[in-house]
Amino acid sequence: MTINDQRFLMLLHRAMPNACEERRPPRSSTTRLVSWGIAVAATVCALFWGIPRLADPLARLTPVQWEAAFGQHVNEAFVQKTPMCRGEAGGAALQSLTERLAVTMPTGAPFTVRVHRSPVVNAFALPGGYIVVFQGLISAAQSPEEVAGVLAHEMAHQVQRHPLRGLVHAMGLRMVSGTVLGGFSAAAASGAHLGEVVFTLSYSRETETEADRVGVEMLNKADIRGEGLIDFFTRYQATDEVKSAHHGVKESVEDQLMSFLSTHPPGKERIAAIRALVRGKGDALTAKQWKALRTICDENTP
């Protein structure tokens, strides 16, 4: 393998000082076999150990244009699998809320937020400013401030480039599995597959704390009550067992909500930390806008 990117080589050398040493070609079949085994072991170690360490710096080095194009590809593939809700009034209400939050950030990057028809109570950010919100989350929310809190949290993940960092980390591990088991298929690399990877990403405690802080900061600057995120987290905190979304159709909204909580575990300390940051006092949407958003998937539009 030949690598010419000097910044990547520098990062690789920092993570694995011995990975870039020059080796002489093997002189016998036995030597070749041993060398091949060492190479495979080194590759496995690099991807399981080196990629996680390199995920953050590699994500920071990725050009914004590349990230946006990548996110668009994943988003388009995901849309083909899960139909979008196209209610015009609801879409306008969501766009208004999104823009109100986006202008609080200095990045100026646009956000594209879409609601998808699914009972799953979840939302997640894709690279490049794309955010997927499931119908089930809007149905489970008891106020527009709860939706605003979740939306601000996911937008904060994107501002900090957490989805891209998570994909660099996760796909490094999957690449090893594909190689060892017989090849990394095109299907595994498809946008739809990557969308599923993002959907199941579980961020670290530090990453979630960062998204909480930035998300509440957005709510404060937009003068939106931040208690919505707290209410959303605490309403089902007493549930003992967290259930993931892929276990089938849920029997209740409470069970469906566990999908979101499984990737965003609240915890009493985390909720207290969020509460200490809340400063906003205003409404997220008008009563008319909230009604429109609640029925965004009910309207018959082309």
Describe the function of each predicted region.
Residues 4-9, 13-302:
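A Zn2+-metalloprotease active-site environment signal
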